[in-house]
Amino acid sequence: MTTRVIYPGTFDPITNGHLDLIERAAAMFDHVVVGIAASPSKKPLFDLPERVALTQAITKHLPNVEIVGFSGLLVDFAKESNANILVRGLRAVSDFEYEFQLANMNRRLMPELETVFLTPSEENSFISSTIVKEVALHKGDVSQFVDLRITGALNAKLHTK
């Protein structure tokens, strides 16, 4: 039986922390669907097609990873993707309470959906898309936190008119 999992997020932008979890999930499971949420309420810097394209570009080396944009309920996306395992990252203990609530809600809405938590590697444990965007906005060097293609996209989006 093939194990299909989804790793959902906004990925605005995708960071080395996200990539670390995608690579580790790809090593653990047969097929990983990276679900990029439209998340219009978060007012993302990059639109959904841009986030999908950037994520595809930096995950090309992973043959069992598929990048898909989605909107709506995560459980509906899980059903559409034929996935019954949800991968989530936990950077800190403070993430756990929220993620625990989400896991329970998702299980209530889709009882066959299991949530697996992965912790990032130590060098990625503090990275967040929000912090990366803030540093990039102020022309700080984010190249150690994101792929160079993401650095270029951030600079183009934030500093060219």
Swiss-Prot record:
Residue sites binding ATP per the record: 10-11, 18, 89-91, 99, 124-130
> Which family would the database say this protein is a member of?
Belongs to the bacterial CoaD family.
Catalyzed reactions per annotation: (R)-4'-phosphopantetheine + ATP + H(+) = 3'-dephospho-CoA + diphosphate
Compartments where located: Cytoplasm
Supply the EC number(s).
Answer: 2.7.7.3
Give binding positions for substrate: 10, 42, 74, 88
- UniProt-listed NCBIfam families: coaD_prev_kdtB, cyt_tran_rel
Query: Superkingdom of this entry's organism?
Result: Bacteria
SUPFAM superfamilies cross-referenced by the UniProt entry: Nucleotidylyl transferase (SSF52374)
* Name this protein carries in UniProt: Phosphopantetheine adenylyltransferase
Which Gene Ontology terms cover its molecular function? ATP binding; pantetheine-phosphate adenylyltransferase activity
Gene Ontology terms: cellular component:
cytoplasm
Required cofactor(s)? Mg(2+)
Recorded metabolic or biological pathway in which this protein acts? Cofactor biosynthesis; coenzyme A biosynthesis; CoA from (R)-pantothenate: step 4/5
Q: Which GO terms describe its biological process?
A: coenzyme A biosynthetic process
Classification via InterPro entries: Cyt_trans-like, PPAT, Rossmann-like_a/b/a_fold
Has the keyword Nucleotidyltransferase been applied to this entry? yes
Q: What does this protein do?
A: Reversibly transfers an adenylyl group from ATP to 4'-phosphopantetheine, yielding dephospho-CoA (dPCoA) and pyrophosphate.
